[in-house]
Amino acid sequence: TREEAHIVSPGLERPMVAAALGGSPSTPAGGLIAEVVRFPDMTALEAAPNSAVVGRIVFIDEHMSRAQDGAGYGVAVRKRGRCAPIAQAKGAAACLIRAVGTDTHRFAHQGGSSRQSQGASLPAMSISPADADVLANLLGRGAVRVRLDITAEIRENAQSGNVIAEIRGRERPEEIVLLAAHLDSWDMGQGAIDDGSGVAIISAAARLIRDLPRRPRRTIRILLAGAEENGVHGGAAYGRAHASEAANHIVALESDFGAGHVWRFDTQFAESALPYARAFQRALSPLGVLPGPNQADGGADVSAMKELGVPVVDLSQDGTNYFDHHHTPDDTLYAIDRADLRQNVAAWATFVYLAADGDWSFRAPAAE
C-alpha cells in the first residue's frame, strides 16, 4: 500500500506524514495534484457552494479538544467519516483531514471513512497535526497545491470470530454478567491501548475472581470481540446469537478506552435500582472512583445487548491523553502506566464480583 502526500507549491515540495483512511480508494496511477481548499469544520464544508470545491482537495482543519471523558472525539471524528461523501457530492477531487487526535506529533491517525452507498468514494487521508499546521499557514498566504498518491484495495470480507469464556455461577449459572473488549486494532501501532489493554483488564479481573475459594452465584462471561474496528461486527454477532438470553443478562460492560485510571462509575439502571448504583460506587471509592450519572454508554461491543434492554455500566477511564496515541504508531505498550492498569483490574474485579454474587436486578420491576 502506498499512502503519500506532498505539498508541491508554492515553489516547494514538502512531504507530509499521512495515512490513507480506511475505505479510501486509490488515486489515479501516479497520484493526483490539485489545489487545496480549507474549511475549519464540517459545517463550513456543508454550507460551501459547489463552485468552491469542484476539482479541489478539501482540507478539514478542525482541531480536537482534550477532555478527561474524551468528549472531543465525538465532535472531531465526524470529519473522518463524512468528509469524503460530502466532498464527493460537491465535486471535490479528494479529502484531507487534520488527524483526529490531541497530540502535536508528526503522526497521522488512522480510522474508517464512510463510502457512498453505490461504493464510490473519494481518496481520503489524515495528515499529522504538525503538517496540518504547515498547510494551514501556507494557505493563509495564497494558493497551495498538494499531490496525493494512494494505492489501496478493498477486499472481500473475510472470516473473523469472537472468543467467549465463562466462569459458571455456582447457584444461578443462567444469569450472566457480560464483560467485553475487542481483539482487533488498526495497523499503524501495536493496538496496546486499543484494545489490548481492555483484553488484559477484563481477563485479569476474571482470573482474580476465578481463583477465589468460592465462585460467585452468577455466571461471568467474557466476550473478546472480533472485527470491531471495521463495524462492530463481533459485538453485533454476539447480540444476534444471544438475543434469546437477553433477559438473563444482568448487566454488561466493556473496556475499550485505553488504560487510564478508572475515575468515575456510570450506570444505566432503572430508577428503582439507583440505590444499588450508590452501593457499588461506595465499594469502588477506595480506588478513587467517583459517582457518575445514570447515562452509561456500555461500549460498542455490548451495544447490541443494550438495545435488547440489558442494563449497562461504564467504569470510565481517564482519557485525557488517550487520543495522543489512539490509532497511531504511538499505540504501544509504552503508552500504558502499570499502576493505572492495576487500578483498572481492581475496579473491574470489585464491580464484577459484587454484581455476580448478589441478588440485585438493575431493571425496572415487571408490571403486575
Language model feature labels by segment:
Residues 1-3, 128, 159-184:
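Acidic/His- and Gly-rich active-site-bordering loop/insert found
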Residues 1-57, 61-69:
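Noncatalytic luminal/extracellular "stalk/propeptide" segments of secretory-pathway proteins
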Residues 38, 57-61, 93-98, 124-126, ...:
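Structural recognition of the beta-strand scaffold that forms the well-ordered cores
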